[in-house]
């Protein structure tokens, strides 16, 4: 079994919903990080064996969005690739699939990541529109929101993920004060990291054309440095009338892309690459669909057991803040201390472009390990319909 190494990373700044990246399609965003990572690694596109990218909200954007992105990035059309849809875990599973290709000897060099434009998610009519409406009496046709229907709703329970998380929070006895505290520290940490220039090594700035000219977007748009516990406490519940979750302690709807270049020893020697980290392995697990926020817990336990590790062995942990509840569960159930968890913020402050985040977490984890001189890192996240994934890395 061969080893798989991360040799380069890149991500876009994360754009707010309807913000600076709203005119960029998912393939535009993907192309940007593909091009950036090849430039950073100083290799041609034809060196790749494959590209694998996560994407969820693809309706109306055409066939095989990662291949569209690759062509835009100048990767030769003789290099093929595919998309992964595992909802929020899409980007992470893309990295895991690339790792499996490398370790099995099927590929030497694979580009993996995720891309999502939640701002460009459209609306759709049901199949009834194709065959004609004979009568609408009693059966009105409504436009459905692709973002809500394909991205944020559990079809098994026919329930939004926010209200499902409210149910889980009630079961665990999680309070409004606890989730607001998570949100406060998320913004505080992200704002401090941005002010210190920590994300500059990750972000490939994007030129944004406006009526006033061209501007350079080089920072994440969703961070609110002025967030306080008092301002969070004033927000109304977002999903249930008496709930604890608000727009302030749930992840942001966002746009963005992230990529990692994964290589074996042969590719490293052939192209004179410098490995950043070794991918120890990945895992996945699933629970009842409405309990999705719990799913990273068994995924992490499975990963740790397989590689004879303890959760305490990891120097840093990135677990996506789909909701602040996720952070509390990682702390309570796995014993991850807050000083190791999401040290630069996460989905609440940085944003959560769903098909991208799984890859973005690994990119940011590597930044943290480098800055903190840590050795072992863990990235994990939940995904809609009850699943979760986890990846462990060793910084070199």
Where do the PLM segments sit?
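Conserved catalytic cysteine-centered active-site region
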Residues: 55-110, 142-144, 155-161, 226-252, ...
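Active-site-proximal alpha-helical scaffold in enzymes
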Residues: 86-116, 169-198, 259-266, 331-332, ...
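Flexible glycine-/small-residue-enriched beta->alpha junction loops
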Residues: 109-167
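N-terminal extracellular/periplasmic Venus flytrap/periplasmic-binding protein-like
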Residues: 11-12, 22-32, 40, 178-265, ...
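Condensing-enzyme catalytic core mediating Claisen C-C bond formation in acyl metabolism
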Residues: 1-25, 143, 229-294, 298, ...
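Active-site pocket-lining segment
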Residues: 164-166, 199-202, 209-210, 280-349
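Short, well-ordered amphipathic alpha-helical segments that serve as non-catalytic structural scaffolds
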Residues: 26-42, 65-69, 94, 161-168, ...
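Conserved beta-ketoacyl condensing-enzyme motif
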Residues: 22-110, 115-134, 203-218, 290, ...
